[in-house]
Regions:
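Extended catalytic/binding region for NAD+/ADP-ribose chemistry, centered on the ART fold
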Residues: 37-67
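Active-site and NAD+-binding cores of ADP-ribose-processing enzymes
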Residues: 1-36, 67-188
Length: 188
């Protein structure tokens, strides 16, 4: 199995609702799978992070490619946190060369969600006990994101949290790369 090691202390990026804790393995007990790699069986939660700030922002805020403007509400209600695991993470590479080694293709990053939850369950149960998987961002194929499995020995340090509204210049620059801009009012 193609497993990459992410060193303890490596900064990972998470965009989340401002009042909520950035460390959340969802979707939560009794809630049906809603995101790409959520466990199909519901036996464990998933924490979604980006390897870069830009990747985390793309996966969270740029979910509608047809919209040329991002609502300020999307910005004012969210923050970005830097997290780092206190131990190394063993991550299954579900992108690039890892796809062929696993016998799949990039539909795991762009296709229907249902098979992805089954992949998460299978990898969770695998004898190698990986901590999660790395996948190509659906909203920016140059970015790699992680779906981390809820494991009892996984703990994170919080390196910092910034409201997205506090880094508007950086957010605007990132959005410009994608040909988008900020809307000064509600949803557009």
């Amino acid at each position: 199995m193609p497993i990459d090691l992410i060193a303890a202390g490596q900064v990972l990026h998470r965009v989340h609702r401002t009042p909520l804790d950035p460390i959340f393995f969802g979707p939560g007990p009794g809630i049906a799978a809603t995101n790409r790699f959520d466990s199909a069986s519901g036996r464990f939660g998933i924490l979604y992070v980006g390897m870069s700030r830009r990747g985390a922002i793309a996966e969270t805020i740029l979910r509608n490619p047809q919209r040329l403007m991002v609502s300020m509400t999307e910005i004012t209600t969210r923050a970005i946190s830097e997290l780092s695991c206190i131990r190394p993470l063993r991550i299954v590479r579900m992108h690039g060369t890892g796809l062929q080694a696993l016998g799949t293709d990039n539909a795991v990053s762009t296709g229907p969600y249902e098979p992805c939850g089954l992949w998460a369950d299978a990898l969770w149960d695998h004898a190698d006990q990986p901590d999660g998987l790395a996948y190509q961002s659906r909203h920016d194929s140059s970015e790699i994101c992680l779906a981390l499995f809820e494991r009892s020995d996984m703990a994170f340090d919080r390196k910092g949290m910034l409201p997205l509204s506090g880094i508007l210049k950086e957010i605007a620059a990132i959005l410009e790369v994608y040909g988008k801009s900020l809307s000064p009012v509600g949803p557009v």
